Each structure stands twice: as structure tokens, then as C-alpha cells.
């Protein structure tokens, strides 16, 4: 769990997302409150519940991007799911408890990665011994082993091919399966391979032919897993899930829309299934029970057709912090193209550089691109910042196609170039509906 202050979190998000100050502040405070709660003792720590967030705003203004960047910042188990993927219990499809099972799997991966770092030095020594064994055999004399060890460390044997035994992480063509509509079965996903490997005593291994250099990553990973206490990995992962876990529920407005159609899986039913999860319940996973009382839920939706008040009143009450994200204006588009750390313009310049083409954009070209994107959003459909990708692709279509033949040249994109390639299309509403 990271210990950034709210100001530092907002500053980090500012590098990638333009505007939306209120939303950034809300998620920054929520993330910091996780850390504050960890500093409390006993009963008070149990009583402090996370303040779940509902982000409301049109498409393409940064809701999903905020969640994506927050995941990297948090250093905590984080899962992003679309609310529309789930069905009411009793219908074939994913039930909402799968969210928590996915969160536990992510936590297991995070904890294992962190614990691998602690045993990396020891794992590297063991990996070196296994490479030597593959090179000279088990019966080689100490002098031979030392001679090969020196060559190995000097990199003289990097390209030599060896055969090694590593753990078989695949499922061997035997798929796991879910039991539809049976969340009470308390097993989540049954994996036949897991059962067979336990019955036969230990993990399966497989032979792989690889070069000495490439074998190190495989063997260090394999040896690290052998040195890890798997029970401790699970214990830490369950603790991280319960106390630091964050669930981002996207497209929540799609299950809020009222429907008169009966007989099918109810959207209201999905909301009702979400209620205990958000309020606090115990979910059975294959690693053990997980309490959801202190998991932070961030829900988001455009609410074009429905409105937040269409959600079940009980669910509204579980999302006490409301944040509205505003629609983007022309100046925001200009800033998105120029100020963000990995802006579209920087991406295209870097991509063209790989072909030996030196691409530059003038200020009036950037202004023109932003203006066209805003006009199209107003006249066709408002898809927010995503419109910039469509416009940029159209403008650079010719250059991208001819780039291999332009090696060593410089290309300047100005307002006239932008106008020539998308100006007419953007003004023709009928055409732009299909092309832009």
C-alpha cells in the first residue's frame, strides 16, 4: 500500500489526466484514508468504513483513466470490472462474487511478486547450480564445475542451448469450469488440473529447450516459488484484499436503466446482488473466506439514459461520495495533446521516429485538431477525448502509410495540412458520422 499524500496523488494523476480536479481529490482522499485506517488500533480500526465513490460524467472525460492510473499508484489489489458483465444469481453468467475472487487472484500475484524479491539472491544461486547441472551433468568433478561456472559468469556460454525442467504452469488442456448459479457452493472455480496435481503429490514439470541466457529468468522464477512459503503468500494476500482492496465498477449506469421487460435476467437483480458486497459480506474463495467490509468500491457511469436516482435507494446509500466530471472543452483538448506525459502527439512522434521520419506539429495544427474534435463532438456524438484519436489517425493516415519510404525526411504538420485532410469531412455532417 502506498503512502502518498492526497496532494501527491493528485499531482501524479495530473501528469496523465487533464482537469477533473474534484474526481482526483475524491479518489486521493479515499486512497489516503486506507493508510490512515491502518494506523488505528483495535475497535476503532474495525469501525472505520471506506467511503465509496460514485463518479458521474459523459464518456471520454477521464473516469476509466483515473481508475487505471490509480491502480498503478495504489500498490494494492485492484480490479476493474464492467457492471454489465454480471447477471442475477440463478441465471447462467458471472455472479458478482466473482469480482472478489478475481481481486484475491490479483492480490496473490502482487504478494508473490513482492516476496520473490526477498528471496531473489538465494534463487539466483540455485538457478546457477541448475544451469551448471544442465551443462556438465550431476556427476561432473568440482574442478569441471568451477571451470564452467567461470565461463558462465563471464557470459561465454550465453548462446549455448540447454534442456531444463521447469514447473508446468499451464492447465495441460484441461480447463477449469464454473458451476453456473451456485455461488453458495463456496468453491468459485474448480480446476481439475489442481486436483490431479495434488492427488499425484506435487506440481507437474515439463522439459524446455532454451539458451543459457534465457534460462535464467525461468529458473530464478521457478526457484523463487520453491523458496516461498505458499501459506504465507495466501495469508498476506487475503489480508491485503480485505484491508487494501479496491474495486472499480464501470458502466454502473447500464444496470440502473429501468426496464419493463420481464422474464429475463433483471438489472435490478444485479444491483441487489451488489448490495451485500458493497455493504460488507463474506465471500468464499478457493484460498479461504474474504470479508468485504473494508474493500473500497468506486463506481462510475455516464448516466445518459438513466440517472443516479434510478439506482436502488439502498445502493445509492452505499455510494455516499458523488463526484461529477465535466465535459471537455477546446482548451482541454489542446492541453491533452500537449501537456500529458504520453500525449497522442508524443506517441506519434515516437512511432514515426522508428521509421526515421522526424515529425513535428505546429501550435496552429494542435489548435486546429482540438477545434475539429470539439466540433465533431457537438455535431455527431460526444465521445470526449477519444475523438482526438479518430481525428489524429485520419490526419496522419498518409504519413503512416508512406513512412517506410520516407526514411531520413522531416514532416511538419500545420493547420493547412490538418484542414486539407479532415476539414471537409468534419464540415460534412453526414460523412463525418461514418468516417470520423
UniProtKB/Swiss-Prot annotation:
A double ring-shaped homohexamer of HslV is capped on each side by a ring-shaped HslU homohexamer. The assembly of the HslU/HslV complex is dependent on binding of ATP. This is ATP-dependent protease ATPase subunit HslU. Keywords: ATP-binding, Chaperone, Cytoplasm, Nucleotide-binding. InterPro entries: AAA+_ATPase, ATP-dep_Clp_protease_ClpX, ATPase_AAA_core, Clp_ATPase_C, HslU, P-loop_NTPase. GO terms for biological process: protein unfolding; proteolysis involved in protein catabolic process. GO terms for cellular component: HslUV protease complex. Belongs to the ClpX chaperone family. HslU subfamily. It is found in: Cytoplasm. GO terms for molecular function: ATP binding; ATP hydrolysis activity; peptidase activity; proteasome-activating activity. PANTHER family: ATP-DEPENDENT CLP PROTEASE ATP-BINDING SUBUNIT CLPX-LIKE, MITOCHONDRIAL-RELATED, ATP-DEPENDENT PROTEASE ATPASE SUBUNIT HSLU. ATP binds at residues 18, 60-65, 250, 314, 386. ATPase subunit of a proteasome-like degradation complex; this subunit has chaperone activity. The binding of ATP and its subsequent hydrolysis by HslU are essential for unfolding of protein substrates subsequently hydrolyzed by HslV. HslU recognizes the N-terminal part of its protein substrates and unfolds these before they are guided to HslV for hydrolysis.
Amino acid at each position: 500500500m502506498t503512502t502518498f499524500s492526497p496532494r501527491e496523488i493528485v499531482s501524479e494523476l495530473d501528469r496523465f489526466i487533464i482537469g477533473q480536479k474534484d474526481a482526483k481529490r475524491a479518489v486521493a482522499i479515499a486512497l489516503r484514508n486506507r493508510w490512515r485506517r491502518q494506523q488505528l488500533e483495535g475497535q476503532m480500526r474495525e469501525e472505520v468504513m471506506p467511503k465509496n465513490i460514485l463518479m458521474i460524467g459523459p464518456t471520454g472525460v477521464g473516469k476509466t483513466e483515473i481508475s487505471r492510473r490509480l491502480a498503478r499508484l495504489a500498490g494494492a489489489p485492484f480490479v476493474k470490472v464492467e457492471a454489465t458483465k454480471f447477471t442475477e444469481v440463478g441465471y447462467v453468467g458471472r455472479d458478482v462474487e466473482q469480482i472478489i475472487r478475481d481481486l484475491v487472484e490479483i492480490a496473490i500475484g502482487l504478494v508473490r511478486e513482492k516476496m520473490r524479491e526477498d528471496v531473489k539472491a538465494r534463487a539466483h544461486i540455485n538457478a546457477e547450480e541448475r544451469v551448471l547441472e544442465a551443462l556438465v551433468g550431476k556427476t561432473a568433478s568440482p574442478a569441471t564445475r568451477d571451470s564452467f561456472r567461470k565461463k558462465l559468469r563471464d557470459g561465454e556460454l550465453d548462446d549455448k542451448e540447454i534442456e531444463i525442467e521447469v514447473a508446468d504452469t499451464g492447465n495441460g488442456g484441461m480447463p477449469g469450469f464454473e458451476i453456473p448459479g451456485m455461488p453458495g457452493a463456496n468453491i468459485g472455480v474448480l480446476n481439475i488440473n489442481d486436483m490431479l496435481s495434488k492427488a499425484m503429490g506435487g506440481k507437474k514439470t515439463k522439459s524446455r529447450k532454451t539458451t543459457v541466457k534465457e534460462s535464467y529468468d525461468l529458473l530464478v522464477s521457478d526457484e523463487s516459488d520453491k523458496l516461498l512459503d505458499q501459506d504465507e503468500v495466501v495469508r498476506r494476500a487475503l489480508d491485503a484484499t480485505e484491508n487494501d482492496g479496491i474495486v472499480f465498477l464501470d458502466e454502473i449506469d447500464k444496470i440502473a436503466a429501468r426496464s419493463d421487460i420481464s422474464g429475463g435476467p433483471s438489472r435490478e437483480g444485479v444491483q441487489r446482488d451488489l448490495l451485500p458486497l458493497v455493504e460488507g459480506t463474506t465471500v468464499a474463495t478457493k484460498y479461504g473466506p474474504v470479508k468485504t467490509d473494508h474493500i473500497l468500491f468506486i463506481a462510475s457511469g455516464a448516466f445518459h439514459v438513466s440517472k443516479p436516482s434510478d439506482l436502488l435507494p439502498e445502493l445509492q446509500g452505499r455510494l455516499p461520495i458523488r463526484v461529477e466530471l465535466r465535459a471537455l472543452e477546446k482548451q482541454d483538448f489542446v492541453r491533452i495533446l500537449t501537456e500529458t506525459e504520453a500525449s497522442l502527439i508524443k506517441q506519434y512522434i515516437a512511432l514515426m521516429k522508428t521509421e526515421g521520419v522526424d515529425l513535428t506539429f505546429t501550435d496552429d495544427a494542435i489548435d486546429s485538431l482540438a477545434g475539429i474534435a470539439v466540433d465533431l463532438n457537438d455535431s455527431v456524438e460526444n465521445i470526449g477525448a477519444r475523438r482526438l484519436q479518430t481525428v489524429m489517425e485520419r490526419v496522419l493516415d498518409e504519413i503512416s502509410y508512406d513512412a517506410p519510404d520516407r526514411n531520413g525526411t522531416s514532416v511538419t504538420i500545420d493547420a493547412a495540412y490538418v484542414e486539407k485532410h479532415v476539414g471537409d469531412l468534419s464540415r460534412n455532417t453526414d460523412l463525418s458520422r461514418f468516417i470520423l
